[in-house]
Amino acid sequence: MILVLVMQNKFKRKDFLKLALLTNLALMAKPLEVFSEKFADLNFPSSNDNVRYFKKGDADYNLLRKGFNKRIDKFPLIIALCKNTAGVTEAVKYAKQNGLPVAIKSGGHCMEGFSCNDGGMVINLSLLNKIEWIDANNIKVGPGCTLSNIYDEIIPQGKMLPGGSCAGVGIGGLTLGGGYGLLARKFGLTCDSLQEITMVDGKGNTINSANDKELLWACRGGGNGNFGVITEMKFKLFKAPAWLQSYRFKSYKVDTKKAKTVLQKWFQVTANLPTGCFSAFVLNRKTIYILLTNVDKHNAAVQKVVDTLSALTEKTTKTKPQPITTALKVFYGRSEPLYFKNASAGLYKNFADIEACIDKTIDTVIATPGMIYQVNTLGGNIENVEAEKVSAFPHRVFTYFSELQTYWDFPKQEAPLLQKFEQVQMLFIGNGIKTQYRNYPDINFKNWSDMYYGANFLRLQQIKNKYDPENIIRHEQSIKAR
């Protein structure tokens, strides 16, 4: 059976209201500043059934330009809200003809706002949100589908696509940068399930990866805003786990010595974590929070982890196994945009990788309100050798991924928090942590090409040369043609 979920054929006002709800962008519009005179040199494109264009001053412009991170405030010259591949083609050709850089937005969750720009064109893919069943084990989706859209469609059919836990994230950006989550250790990265893509390249040509396996390789972990605009993605699916059980372990009022001891022991106990399990260590000021989830049968190996972490911390909370749909929604997270910075703080093989700098890191986190240091388990089927051969994601040898986060309520709090944030990042980099996850970018990474892509960068650059030699598709850390 082929089931297609589509938006209405014609653009209507209510479509944009729905879009606001789906992408969590229903924000108060700020007063408009005087915009660039650049339009004096352009013929503003006409909207049609394939694409609708917006400029500053239009009713939906502010709604469409904003993303999940309120820290990012950019003003594109034109927003192209595309309905299909033809609309994307038209928008890219217009941008190319008029020398406008193109940023691509599916869910708007890029940590550094690379899905928007100042003075260029943003191609908004929110309406490319079809889900089509090819057969019982494969689907085609538009890049504008959010994770919750996909989960709500496939889990009732007993199927799973390993993705993240944040409901509003777009499948396009998640996949193109790798894509990990609670089920990655069991099923692999999101990009490992990617079978085929359709893309409009920087020349305005429509390309299908069935005719270019090198392009598919690149889009499995190396494709974020680099080569073109993805308009369709084909994924293989797995049998969905029936249940998910979670455990939460907490310690309070910890000092640096205690936090370091718990973290070191957590590394040891998770080194041989069962494949169906995921764990995260979280330090939020003086509180330690450890999450453990399991989608396989509870056995002695899982119980050993539970017992060790319980003995190490002060409070253990155990949930009964829940249906996978219900359990995942617990982790969907906040839907409203907020002020924050969240970036990769390195990929590790073990505690020894950070031992030299972890004391100062913990000192800073404990002393800084709003700052969080988190380490997540990788490994399991992410380390799949066959997947490594056919994907650009370069970090499978690492079994842990860390992230640094900081949050605030008012703009005046931003500068001192970002200063502390950068201090911690420099601690890691100064102690040899130089491998980073592209889906959690940091605008301050200097050698980002090596950090994100490693030895694969030159190969990715060759693909950029082929599909976008004029560098039309670009952002602050996109791969540039040579």
Residue map of PLM features:
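Soluble FAD-dependent oxygen oxidases
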Residues: 2-482
